[in-house]
C-alpha cells in the first residue's frame, strides 16, 4: 500500500512540477510530507523551495494531492516577490493576529553594523505591526475557502523586511530582523548559533524523519529567549497531539558556527 502511494506521489510531482524529471522518491515524499504538515496544522506555512515551478504548476500539484485524498483542508498559495508560500490560512491568521496584539515579537537584530546579535528595540514594533496588519489584510479574505480547495494570490513589491515576514509566517519562535536601509548583510558570521531541528515520521504516507522546522537562535540571546522557546515547544507538542498525520516528534538541538549565514 505504501509503495503504491509512494509511486503515485513521485509521479504527481514529476508530472505537475517544472524540471522534476529527475526528482528522487525521497525528495517527492519530503515535499508531500511538508505540505501535509501545513494541512494538519503543525505549522501555518511552507516556503516552497524544491524546484523553480510557478504558481499554477504548484496549484495543479496540490489539487493532485487532494485527488489522492491526502489534503483535506483549504490551502492558499501566496507569491511574494517570486517566493512561493503554501499556507494554512486559518492557522496563519490566528498566529499573525496574536503577533499583532503583542508588544514582544521576539525579534533578533542581526544588522551588519552590530558586533553581535541583540534583541530588537521596542521602537521598531509599530513599523513591524503595520507590516503584519498589511499581510493579514491580504490573506484574511481567503479564510472562507472551502475544505479540500486551493486558492492563489500575490503581493507585488512590498516594502517589508521579507526575512522577518517569512519568519513570522513560518512561525519561528524567534525571528531575525535587520535594518534594510543600511544594507542586507548580517552579523551572524562565525557567531555561535543554537540550531533547532524538529522532525517526525509522517505515518500518513509512510515516510520517516521529516523535517518540520529548522531555525537558529544566537547563543548570545538564547537565555533572553529561553522561556519563549519553551512555550513555543509546548504549543508545538499540543498541536502535534491534535493531529494524526505524524508520529514520533523529536526536537533536536546543537550548536553551529558558520563563515556566512544567508537570510
From Swiss-Prot:
Similarity comment text for this entry: Belongs to the UPF0739 family.
Highest taxon of source: Eukaryota
InterPro entries for this protein: DUF4504
Stretches assigned to coiled coil: none
UniProt protein name: UPF0739 protein C1orf74 homolog
Organism in which the protein naturally occurs: Xenopus tropicalis (Western clawed frog)
Bridged cysteine pairs (disulfide): none
Family matches, as Pfam families: DUF4504
Amino acid at each position: 500500500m505504501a509503495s503504491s502511494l509512494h509511486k503515485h506521489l513521485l509521479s504527481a510531482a514529476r508530472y505537475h512540477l517544472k524540471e522534476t524529471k529527475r526528482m528522487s522518491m525521497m525528495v517527492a515524499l519530503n515535499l508531500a510530507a511538508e505540505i501535509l504538515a501545513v494541512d494538519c496544522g503543525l505549522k501555518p506555512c511552507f516556503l516552497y523551495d524544491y524546484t523553480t515551478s510557478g504558481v499554477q504548476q504548484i496549484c495543479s500539484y496540490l489539487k493532485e494531492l487532494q485527488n489522492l485524498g491526502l489534503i483535506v483542508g483549504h490551502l492558499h498559495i501566496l507569491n511574494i516577490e517570486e517566493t512561493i508560500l503554501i499556507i494554512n490560512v486559518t492557522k496563519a491568521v490566528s498566529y499573525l493576529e496574536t503577533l499583532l496584539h503583542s508588544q514582544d515579537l521576539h525579534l533578533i537584530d542581526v544588522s551588519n553594523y552590530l558586533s553581535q546579535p541583540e534583541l530588537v528595540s521596542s521602537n521598531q514594533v509599530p513599523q513591524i505591526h503595520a507590516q503584519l496588519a498589511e499581510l493579514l489584510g491580504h490573506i484574511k479574505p481567503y479564510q472562507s475557502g472551502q475544505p479540500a480547495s486551493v486558492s492563489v494570490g500575490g503581493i507585488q513589491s512590498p516594502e517589508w523586511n521579507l526575512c522577518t515576514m517569512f519568519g513570522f509566517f513560518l512561525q519561528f519562535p524567534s525571528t531575525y530582523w535587520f535594518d534594510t536601509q543600511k544594507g542586507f548583510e548580517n552579523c551572524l558570521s562565525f557567531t555561535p548559533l543554537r540550531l533547532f531541528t524538529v522532525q517526525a515520521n509522517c505515518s500518513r504516507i509512510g515516510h520517516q524523519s521529516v523535517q518540520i522546522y529548522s531555525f537558529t537562535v544566537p547563543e548570545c540571546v538564547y537565555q533572553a529567549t529561553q522561556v519563549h522557546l519553551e512555550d513555543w515547544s509546548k504549543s508545538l507538542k499540543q498541536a502535534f497531539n491534535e493531529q494524526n498525520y505524524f508520529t514520533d516528534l523529536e526536537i533536536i538541538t546543537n550548536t553551529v558556527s558558520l563563515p556566512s549565514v544567508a537570510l
